[in-house]
């Protein structure tokens, strides 16, 4: 069960849409003063080298962040250069903040992105769960280098199970009870799909006003095909707004699709401005990451 290591996939196209959506969602939630409890159920190692052995072995950043940056540079030099959409710019600024020399050598995972967005008056709290023994140790070591204080808690635990004790969230320093949860298991175990649905259902019962984000792979597997449908049903039954962003980068020119070629981000109780911001961003990201044939993107909502 511990064969998956995100270091092999850091900065790929799935990370681009995952973190683009994550940043845009939290930015909206932070427009209100109330503190937020933020939970990352499958945190990974937190920070990754894009020039390290793991990422170079997978090479997936070449079809993700590296390709996006290259295409944006080309567009900026063209005659019809257009402003970069706000949500995409926020994502690019976040990546750049971890690479001050201008070269993309480091890629922040969701724990480091979320830590960078915590408001410094202790209003927001970050709770990180990672069960993989190696990644959990790396996460603790990486976070130890941050000036995190008591704003971050790390536990080597099953995020699916530990999430239950996080909701409803405790009152923040401002007295508010607000929560945002990111759920992105590896799905290498088939039961992960069912656990995601069960956890979202449980979350909505425990804390109906929370915002819940789910990343999922788009692969030829019945469980993967059914997951967004089941999340839509849960959201509609709970009368919550939802967004489903999908990106398929397409096949290589030789028709092959080495590695994952499509994934999605589903947001339950989505902020009302999010769909437009994501659509604007994807109008740039989608074409930039497209390859060969079979590429597409969509931003669906209720």
Describe the predicted segments one by one.
Residues 1-302:
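Class I S-adenosyl-L-methionine-dependent methyltransferase catalytic core
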């Amino acid at each position: 069960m511990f064969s998956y290591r995100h270091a092999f996939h850091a900065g790929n196209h799935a990370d681009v849409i995952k973190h683009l959506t994550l940043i845009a969602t939290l930015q909206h939630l932070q427009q209100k003063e109330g503190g937020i409890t933020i939970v990352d159920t499958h945190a990974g190692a937190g920070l990754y080298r894009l020039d390290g052995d793991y990422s170079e072995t997978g090479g997936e950043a070449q079809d993700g962040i590296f390709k996006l940056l290259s295409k944006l540079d080309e567009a900026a030099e063209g005659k019809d250069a257009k402003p970069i959409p706000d949500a995409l710019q926020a994502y690019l600024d976040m990546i750049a903040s971890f690479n001050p020399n201008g070269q993309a050598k480091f890629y922040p995972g969701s724990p480091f992105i979320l830590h960078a967005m915590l408001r410094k008056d202790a209003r927001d709290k970050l709770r990180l769960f990672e069960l993989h023994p190696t990644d959990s140790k790396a996460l603790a070591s990486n976070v130890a280098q941050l000036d995190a204080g008591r704003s971050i808690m790390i536990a080597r635990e099953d995020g699916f199970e530990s999430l239950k004790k996080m909701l409803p969230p405790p009152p923040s320093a401002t007295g508010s009870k607000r929560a945002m949860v990111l759920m992105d298991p590896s799905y290498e175990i088939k039961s992960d799909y069912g656990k995601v649905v069960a956890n979202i259902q449980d979350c909505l019962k425990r804390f109906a006003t929370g915002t819940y984000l789910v990343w999922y792979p788009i692969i030829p597997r019945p469980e993967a095909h059914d997951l967004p449908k089941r999340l839509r049903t849960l959201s509609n039954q709970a009368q919550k707004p939802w967004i489903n962003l999908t990106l398929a980068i397409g096949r290589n020119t030789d028709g092959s699709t080495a590695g994952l070629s499509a994934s999605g981000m589903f947001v339950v109780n989505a902020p009302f401005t999010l769909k437009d911001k994501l659509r604007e961003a994807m109008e740039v990201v989608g074409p930039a990451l497209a390859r060969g044939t079979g590429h597409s993107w969509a931003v669906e909502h209720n």
